[in-house]
Amino acid sequence: MMLSISLGFLACIILKDSLCIFCFSFCFLLYLNERFHSKRILIVFMILSLFSIVLVKPCKEAEKGIYTISEIKQSYYVAKNQRTRVLVQSDLDLNFKDQIQVNSLEPIHTDDNFTLFSFTKFNASKNVFYKTKSIRILKKSNSLKSKLYAYISSQKNSKVLLSLYYGIHEDTIDEIYTMLGYGYISAYFIVFNLLKRKYEDKKIRISLLILSILFGSFFVFTLSLTRFILYQISYLFFKSKSDQIGFTILFFSILYPTQVLSISFVLPILLQLVSYFCTDYKWIVQKMVLISVLFIYFKKVDIVSFLLFNLLRKFYGCVFLLGMFIPDFVTLKIPSLTIHYAPQYVFILAFIVVYIQCLKHFKWKYMILFLLPFLEVFCNTFFQVYTLNIGQGDCSVIVEPFYKSVVMIDCGQSLYRDNVERIIFPFLENKNIHTIDTLILTHDDFDHSGGYDRLKEKVKIKKVIKDSKDKVNVKYPFYLLLQERKAKDENDSSIISYFTYDHLNYLFMGDASKEIEKQLMDAYDLKADVIKVGHHGSNTSSDAAFLDSLDCKIALISAGYKNKYDHPSTETLKTLDHLNIHTFCTSTDGSIAIYSLHHFAFIVTNDGLFGIIRA
């Protein structure tokens, strides 16, 4: 009963939207009534479903004032007051419970892209939406918690200790063990098994529970530690395994409603459900769940770590207990053999179905799940056009159905980061793209072609086009326009791409100016449903007469967040708005994708915007 109610409450928390919660709750109430025939259960779930609507509301906007450091991460801090929490990125040496004066704040923003980790969304999941711009220290803490952190940070093997005790991930330990808190949990069971030879089970559990709470108070209550403490409390109050799991799910969802999809919570709960429901081949199902979840969350699996999972878990438990006394060999990372695979929706849906079936009864045929990575190419039926968010630069990827061809237009680089290493290559890898059939470098500017040398080291590139007179080798109409033109500078020499698929016409302008736009109008009778606006939306491009002649529906702009050029210009945005052209910009919307299948097409952005493109 408790497990059913808790899972229903968890579903409400995940849905977030009030209307979705209402619709789900109505259906779930019918299920509960059919199964339990109890009015009390129905009333309890109705109260919880209403409570979930309150829980999922975002916290209040952060304000200037006095904050206290509550979390320490590898490259930043989190500070809180009575109302909210903020991100602190500072060169100041801060410690737990230090008081700071926050003088100014700004929204957290990162260049987010499909399939890649989003630091902005990660913090939003913890109800942290703002970061400090200016701070000063008011009072250094003299608490035991801050002294412990200072002492551990000064140790020779501090990287290992900080990872195990505080969840501050370092490369010395595989991230999965840090996130799941297996250092502490394994240490707990080592101590438990030693003590139960002499003492009563319940007394040991109560003592270790108190110790766990004290540990969290003096160190940090990570998600994994909180979940583990809740489970230990449930063990003392409930005999039924299902009630124990249900209690853990319910109270974790109440305490951390925005983080119920964290791997620190999801994976242990999935494994506990397997342990409770599965009657045969339990070990195989657990391994299947483990490897699937690792692929879904991390998009890679270290085979060595996976095979030695149980052994390493116990090893890190020993390190946790003896961490202050162990030599430096612990900092040596275990050799890795990594398999990379970014599951698409087909795999995730198949995993959910197979997981539910395995809880009932395992069958060997369910292992066909792991053939999907090899079959997903045949599921890719959409024509896809991606505009990546690489800051103040350009990079677009055009993928034909079933990966028949991949064309990239530009691979811009940045002075502040390696765009290829941080964004372009990981995106291609996560989309299972290992070969680029044609790379079009529109012109020789760093923000358009600067990443080429780095990219060719990472990905096989069959053909590179730097001249409009060349041809793109694809089996759909793809033209490089205005081979003969009067160009006054490098920008006006930009290769202009025009292609058609599924009855949609696309025009990519590079950095071409209004003068080139006039030459295009004189040379061609062009119509374009989608235009990649020239020169990042600068007022040197996007002439109103030119845009009007194209009869565009959608405009795509690639520009950096708060860039020094003020791209896109207000003038360009007003022109697009006046012509009723729906405009999407990477600086505000993140990466942008257009999908089409015959006469059906739609556009989505990384920030969650969605729209159907009418033919």
Annotate each predicted stretch with a short phrase:
Residues 1-7, 27-29, 320, 328-382, ...:
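C-terminal regulatory/interaction regions
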Residues 258-259, 442, 446, 450-455, ...:
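Active-site-proximal loop/helix segments of hydrolase catalytic cores
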Residues 125-232, 236, 480, 505-514, ...:
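Aromatic-rich juxtamembrane segments at the membrane interface
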Residues 361-435, 469-530, 539-541, 588-615:
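Core dinuclear metal-dependent hydrolase active-site scaffold
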Residues 49-177, 421-429, 435, 469, ...:
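Membrane-interface helix/helix-cap signal primarily in integral membrane proteins
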